[in-house]
Amino acid sequence: MQEETEYINVYGARVHNLKDIDAEIPRNSLTVITGLSGSGKSSLAFDTIFAEGQRRYIETFSAYARNFLGNLERPDVDKITGLSPVISIEQKTTNKNPRSTVGTTTEIYDYLRLLYARAGEAYSYLSGEKMVKYTEEQILELILNDYKGKRIYILAPLVRNRKGHYKELFEQIRKKGYLYVRVDGEVREALPGMKLDRYKNHDVEVVIDKLVVADKDDTRLKNSVAVAMRQGDGLLMVLDAQSESVRHYSKRLMCPVTGLSYREPAPHNFSFNSPQGACPKCKGLGVVSQIDIDKIIPDRGLSISGGAIIPLGKAKNSMIFWQIAALLEKYEATLKTPVRELPDDAIDEILYGSDERIKIKSSLIGTSSDYFVTFEGVVKYIQMLQEKDASATAQKWAEQFARTAVCPECHGAKLNKEALSFRIHDKNIYELSTMDINELYDWLMNVDQYLSRKQQQIAVEILKEIRTRLKFLLDVGLDYLSLDRSAVSLSGGESQRIRLATQIGSQLVNVLYILDEPSIGLHQRDNLRLIHSLKELRDMGNSVIVVEHDKDMMLAADYVIDMGPKAGRLGGEVVFAGTPQQMLRTHTLTSRYLNGECAIEVPAERRKGNGHSLWLRGARGNNLKNVDVEFPLGKLICVTGVSGSGKSTLINETLQPILSQKFYRSLQDPLEYGSIEGLEYIDKVVNVDQSPLGRTPRSNPATYTGVFSDIRNLFVGLPEAKIRGYKAGRFSFNVSGGRCEACQGNGYKTIEMNFLPDVYVPCEVCHGKRYNRETLEVRFKGKSIADVLDMTINRAVEFFENVPQILNKIKVIQEVGLGYIKLGQSSTTLSGGESQRVKLATELSKRDTGKTLYILDEPTTGLHFEDIRVLMNVLNKLVDKGNTVIVIEHNLDVIKMA
């Protein structure tokens, strides 16, 4: 092996399916690890190199600190040398916080807040006038000039437009020795026991002094101004005794017309996550929750007794239905009247209640006399459950009848009026955060010429920081995002590239970066900019490892490691390591696709479709410009375009929610659109995404596809099981009976080590088999249920060749290229691409009407050229049966087959 310091050397890696491999990765270079889906790329990059790097870093902490950091198992590897500190940038969209935005994640918004706090100009939100502020000397000067020889009152404002009787306040004023106050514009004597109408809004000022302004240096005026400033917390008013006109003066920012004043701005005043800056109505979220009547009464053809009001369900013998029945009597209707035949007033009363008392007859409730109540309404009932003190279950239940709407107070800006009144070159901070990054960068490059000399001096360093960070975002192809874009709505590829831009911005050196398919979701155009950014990271003195299938990325790399030869058990070896030029001369599966020996062929002829179309008209969500789109049915349709062009908005956020609402009464609201036509030509919609099959390690391909039920039924029918009286539950590892109770069917035990990582050891009772001894004694063709779960799909296809019900379901998993995974493999160990193909296989094995619409978002994520060929065969099978497949994709091999 080479000199160790120039290379990262991995010896004897055995994580997952790696076959005791050695690997050598040059430092300070761009290395691509490629190979089939499931060949061991991520096992080498993330589960071995990154896991060991992170573990070594955590080892440097004290035992006390390690206690809080959770499990970091030592990867199964002999040793790794030459390892630098490791930073992993994965695709997972980890951020589920609705307050997190592109601006806050990249910290650009923090710099903008600083810019506005230090260099922003304040305007009054009442009059639009520019705010002014004075020193005490300037105020004195102004009064001497403006009121020379006039009789004036010096006032200190104490209450501005607030309710209350203010009895205690007047008492305090009298104790301080002041004789007069000005209440709601009228000067009065401060009398003992004085108080105001507590339910009205009032303005109260204390009269500090009444004097005639002299034309020379006036000591009395000077003292009165100082006292008024103290009493009025930096504000004072001057009342002209003759004309009764008032002027406002302040040490703080103040509107010269209305007297409105702002506190000195600080960065937190521009943060929607701080009470000082957030809009008081929506608490800085920009949206509020509103009850959606269409979700309460989705079908007006039903009657109330037939369940038209979803929160109430069908009519029962209960108080709420007696109340509604009594309420309907005055409209000459009953609970059996369809809602569409009820007058609007009746529906309004049912929803929003009324103050009128309703008579409930004694015969109904079995009492001696009639009963009178007021009905609060269904909406009020749901709103009560949304309150903070309701239980989490009740809140969740109520939430399904609500929809989010733009906050009526801040109109989505998230900030309070004061924060939005600070401007730089006519723009407030919200207007900057809604610009796309390209536009914002141009604006900031030209803003200097509009700033005063003082503003320029203050802003120079802040602007430099913001421009640098924006430039990094532009370099990784994110020019179409805006700073106020919610982090939750970003795709995996986008959030990964944002983290990449942040890392380039951090200017670290001697670090090992590991990235997981950064080119996901990137159009070919943006890909070159991404490669340039990765090379920039390398040229700063870092090592970069990229797990990637992209042809351009492989050819631009300094070094390529190709994993294979196949996937799963048949993979886990290094089939090639060297430069891209050397790779083109070899005969690995990857190199054959790169040098053109293998290719995905263009179809000889295109499908005609079934003659029908689905039309979506007037789509205008996010950045869509009122578009009309035709989807011809019975075809493979590819939706493509540069990053941020609106593909996901059109399909995932508009079309799919419309169809889900129509077919499954889904509660997800589509974005704005005009109309949809042609729904009668499809009968179901299936969204096949890359999310995990299940949330727990107990879910696996057998349980997800439903074949596990068939396998359990097969075992129940065996003579041995019948003699013992076993039912299907006996062969489940999720319920007690047949499972091993020592490990509760997990197959392993977790041993808590307190300040060391938790250790997972095979259960000493069942030795990882999950079932108890009696259950394992029932065998089919010599194999127990645990043996069956441990089989690969390829082996299971041979094993069950004479059991058509099981064979049909697992054969399809084999056909989508997953013959190497095990039937009982935990779904948490499957990659995104593998999970998606298990879902596709499940759909393929279902009874098929030929009128299904399938939606796939970037299905080639994580797939090698060969995997894409297999995937396209599967999709073509679906379309050949008459179904329609819509694919959002940038991959040219997929586009050319559409």
Regions found by a protein language model. Name each.
Residues 1-898:
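Conserved phosphate-binding elements of NTP-dependent enzyme cores
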